[in-house]
């Protein structure tokens, strides 16, 4: 359960609780809010107790390790020996975790972020406008004095990055020296700089801070003027000076003084600036591209009132310290939604997510967005993530926002960037998969991003310049290997829970910084708890569906347990929510019944026709003519009675849940499939339509099938799934075709031509499903896409990968 501890009287913002398991004990430290003053969320440390049955818990590596010809060994005894499901519901624990996250999402304003010692030092350097010789913001100096680390440095206390510690520490030493205070702290800080400056040589270049090659030499020059002696013969420093000189020669001074660019973010390191021109490029909040240090530098030179207001507001808001960038409202709103979705817990927060995306859409522009609202500079990372989420949620957004980022055959994050960001191109790739027909710019974006990411993966160069995260190679690898058309929600969640670093993930700006509403252990532990809770139910269902399988002797009709497991896995990976159990089981049983009928009669057209005729007779008479049972072959009779018994159970389940009798609709749907199948013996013809119709009926969704849009959705879904089914059948014994390195397919191969048609139809289907202006219930439309993606997954996912996903999703608990 969640248990509140006594409130802290500490002046800093209260910690937001994280979760911890007591069996076994794993400490999860609380989530700190880094000295912010306005306190909207007040939750103390909490923990969760998971109570399991007395039987010792076991993990289930055998499902991923014990393979026979690429398939898991399915043995009844193995299944029964697995860890038993939880004895008690964790509903209350989950509810309390959800309440915490709801409070977080409901308190969003300009973004929660950590304090930057470097930026705070620049603010502390500002001289009082009315009292020369004294600091304008003494509370910033006090923050510096209060936050020196035990080793004498300033910076992120939990991650040692030499670039971060050195630039933070040198800036703070300069600020203290400037005002001749705390000489002991200055001495300790200077000793740290001298002892650690050589470590710059050993760090990954990808993790060099933004603008470090400009800002750090500038600080060294300031230190020298203040009489602070720092050895400048280090090879690392010489390399930094070389990079600075090269970058300064590339800066288009005429452009930067007349057009907003990312250079506004790092003015404090640039010489010979024309402030009369630059002040015209201020953001509406008075900042220079939302950078406190850049704005403080401008304030020193201009005494501009808008600059002063921006800095003054931050100093008061954060109790003397300031972040490295602020606001970060769009960044926070977008990335929170992405994390919640990938962690599989977004269903708890529909109103909050709607509000988040509505906020983002209000500040969306024809050129995209950046991390903060009302910016005249945009970046591809925030634009791509925003585009993807807005389109997924039915907003009309044009892909033309990406045109400004296209430079020749490449796409860049910013104008004038020196190197690409892995995550920026990764998010561009994710956005490009939301493609509608005729969106050429997204085709080009997908082609470029696929090539770029594959090259980086092949070279083991998946380090990013914007974030240090737990498993970026895993995230990128999954996205490349399992494209969005084949991405099943529960598979993505199961893997992302392991990839998400929680509060250990740290972002790279001018300094390292934290985004506690984006990266925290609260989301992570709630996701783990919810996943295991759902999985426990799925394991119970798996046991029950095996009993249903055995009870009807479906093995005798050509359906083996491997097929049963895969079918249930597909249903569960798409419809995983506990409250949607009837839809999930209906999906699995419908597919198994279709397979049994098609498998048993696949070699005889006459028997198919006989089955179809008897099926219709049974349908019309409910099994009786003049009070006597139909006289048919035992197998046909058994299958027909099996189908109708199962359909009647479906109807009863729907009646109990939704209070609506769907028997007639179910019978009609099955009759349509049977008649279609008996003509050519192809079970795939119309199977998707049967599945979509059945799932929607079980979900309580009814809609007129006469409408043109409904008919178009069925036609597209049937066409694509039929092609995918055949593709899978033809290629099930060989490696599925992979996307070529150029993001397309080899058109000389007949199978590739069919694949291109599938891709074209998928784009149209995605457009129909995501279009919110047609008036159709989005839940109804989503079923069409969900079913189609399951067919896509089956067709293009290697059997070994499927086995791995089955083991992870159904049988391996999250720890």
UniProtKB/Swiss-Prot annotation:
Could you point out where the transit peptide sits in the sequence? Answer: 1-51
Cofactors named for this entry: Mg(2+)
Presence of the UniProt keyword Endoplasmic reticulum in the record: no
**Where do the annotations place Mg(2+) binding?**
379, 381
Highest rank taxon of the organism? Eukaryota
Q: What catalytic activity is recorded?
A: (2E,6E,10E)-geranylgeranyl diphosphate = (-)-kolavenyl diphosphate
Q: Binding positions for substrate?
A: 247, 465
Q: Where in the cell is it found?
A: Plastid, Chloroplast
Assigned GO CC terms? chloroplast
Q: Which UniProt keywords apply?
A: Chloroplast, Isomerase, Magnesium, Metal-binding, Plastid, Transit peptide
Example GO biological process: gibberellin biosynthetic process
Matching Pfam families, A to Z? Terpene_synth (PF01397), Terpene_synth_C (PF03936)
User: What's an example of a GO molecular-function annotation for this chain?
Assistant: magnesium ion binding
Q: Could you list the residue ranges forming a coiled coil in this record?
A: none
Q: Where is this motif: DXDD motif?
A: 379-382
* Activity regulation information from UniProt: Inhibited by high concentrations of magnesium.
Give its E.C. classification number.
Answer: 5.5.1.28
Domain note: The Asp-Xaa-Asp-Asp (DXDD) motif is important for the catalytic activity through binding to Mg(2+).
Its job: Diterpene synthase that catalyzes the formation of (-)-kolavenyl diphosphate from geranylgeranyl diphosphate (GGPP).
Entry's family note? Belongs to the terpene synthase family. Tpsc subfamily.
Supply the name of the protein.
(-)-kolavenyl diphosphate synthase TPS28, chloroplastic
What organism does the UniProt record list as the source?
A: Tripterygium wilfordii
**Lineage of producing organism:** Eukaryota, Viridiplantae, Streptophyta, Embryophyta, Tracheophyta
What gene codes for this chain?
Answer: TPS28
């Amino acid at each position: 359960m969640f248990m509140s501890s006594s409130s802290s009287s500490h002046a800093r913002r209260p910690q937001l609780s994280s979760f911890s398991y007591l069996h076994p004990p794993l400490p999860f430290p609380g989530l700190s809010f880094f000295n912010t003053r306005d306190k909207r969320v007040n939750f103390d440390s909490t923990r969760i107790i998971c109570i399991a049955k007395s039987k010792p818990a076991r993990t289930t590596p055998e499902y991923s390790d014990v393979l026979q010809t690429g398939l898991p060994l399915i043995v009844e005894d193995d299944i029964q020996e697995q860890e038993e499901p939880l004895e008690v519901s964790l509903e209350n624990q989950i509810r309390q975790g959800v309440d915490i996250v709801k409070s977080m999402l409901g308190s969003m304003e300009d973004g929660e972020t950590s304090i930057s010692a470097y930026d705070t030092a620049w603010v502390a350097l500002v001289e009082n406008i009315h009292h020369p010789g004294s600091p304008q913001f003494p509370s910033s100096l006090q923050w510096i004095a209060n936050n020196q680390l035990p080793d004498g440095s300033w910076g992120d206390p939990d991650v040692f990055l030499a670039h971060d510690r050195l630039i933070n520490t040198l800036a703070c030493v300069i600020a203290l020296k400037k005002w001749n205070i705390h000489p002991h702290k200055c001495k300790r800080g200077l000793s740290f700089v001298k002892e650690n400056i050589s470590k710059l040589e050993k760090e990954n270049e990808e993790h060099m801070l933004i603008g470090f090659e400009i800002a750090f030499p500038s600080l060294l020059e300031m230190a020298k003027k203040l009489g602070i002696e720092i050895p400048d013969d280090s090879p690392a420093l010489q390399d930094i000076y070389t990079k600075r000189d090269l970058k300064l020669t590339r800066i288009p001074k005429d452009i930067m003084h007349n057009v907003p660019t990312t250079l506004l973010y790092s003015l404090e390191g640039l010489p010979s600036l024309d402030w009369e021109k630059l002040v015209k490029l201020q953001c509406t909040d008075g900042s220079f591209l939302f950078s406190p240090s850049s704005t403080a530098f401008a304030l020193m030179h201009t005494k501009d009132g808008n600059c002063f207001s921006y800095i003054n507001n931050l100093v008061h808001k954060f109790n003397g310290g300031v972040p490295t960038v602020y606001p970060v409202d769009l960044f926070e709103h977008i990335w929170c939604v992405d994390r919640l979705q990938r962690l599989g817990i977004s269903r708890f927060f529909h109103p909050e997510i709607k509000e988040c995306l509505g906020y983002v859409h209000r500040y969306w522009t024809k050129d995209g967005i950046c991390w903060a609202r009302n910016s005249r500079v945009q970046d591809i990372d925030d634009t791509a993530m925003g585009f993807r989420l807005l389109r997924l949620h039915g907003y009309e957004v044009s892909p033309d926002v990406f045109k400004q980022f296209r430079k020749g055959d490449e796409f860049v994050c910013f104008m004038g960037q020196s190197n690409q960001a892995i995550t920026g191109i990764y998010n561009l790739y994710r956005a490009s998969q939301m493609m509608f027909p005729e969106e050429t710019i997204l085709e080009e974006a997908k082609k470029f991003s696929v090539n770029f990411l594959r090259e980086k993966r092949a070279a083991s160069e998946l380090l990013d310049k914007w974030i240090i995260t737990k498993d970026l190679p895993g995230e990128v690898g999954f996205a490349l290997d399992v494209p969005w058309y084949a991405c099943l929600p529960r598979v993505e969640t199961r893997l992302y829970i392991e990839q998400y670093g929680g509060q250990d993930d740290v972002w790279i700006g001018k300094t390292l910084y934290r985004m506690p509403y984006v990266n925290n252990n609260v989301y992570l532990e709630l996701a783990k708890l919810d996943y295991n809770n759902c999985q426990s139910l799925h394991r119970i269902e798996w046991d029950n569906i095996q009993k249903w399988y055995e009870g009807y002797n479906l093995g005798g009709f050509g359906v083996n347990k491997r097929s049963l497991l895969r079918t249930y896995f597909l249903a569960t990976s798409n419809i995983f929510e506990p409250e949607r159990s009837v839809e999930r089981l209906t999906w699995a049983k419908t597919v198994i019944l279709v397979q049994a009928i098609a498998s048993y009669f696949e070699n005889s057209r006459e028997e198919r026709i006989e089955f179809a005729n008897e099926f219709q007779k049974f349908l019309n008479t409910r099994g009786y003519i003049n009070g006597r049972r139909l006289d048919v072959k035992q197998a046909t009779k058994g299958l027909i009675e099996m189908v109708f018994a199962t359909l009647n159970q479906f109807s009863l389940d729907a009646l109990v849940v939704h209070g609506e009798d769907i028997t007639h609709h179910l019978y009609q749907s099955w009759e349509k499939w049977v008649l279609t199948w008996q003509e050519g013996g192809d079970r795939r013809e119309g199977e998707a339509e049967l599945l979509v119709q059945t799932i929607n009926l079980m979900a309580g969704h009814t809609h007129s099938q006469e409408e043109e849009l409904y008919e178009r959705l069925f036609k597209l879904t049937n066409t694509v799934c039929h092609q995918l089914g055949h593709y899978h059948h033809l290629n099930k014994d060989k490696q599925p075709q992979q996307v070529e390195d150029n993001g397309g397919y080899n058109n000389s191969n007949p199978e590739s031509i069919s694949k291109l048609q599938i891709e074209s139809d998928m784009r149209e289907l995605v457009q129909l499903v995501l279009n919110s202006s047609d008036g159709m219930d989005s839940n109804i439309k989503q079923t069409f896409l969900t079913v189609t993606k399951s067919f896509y997954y089956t067709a293009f996912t290697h059997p070994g990968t499927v086995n791995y996903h089955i083991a992870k999703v159904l049988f391996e608990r999250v720890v």
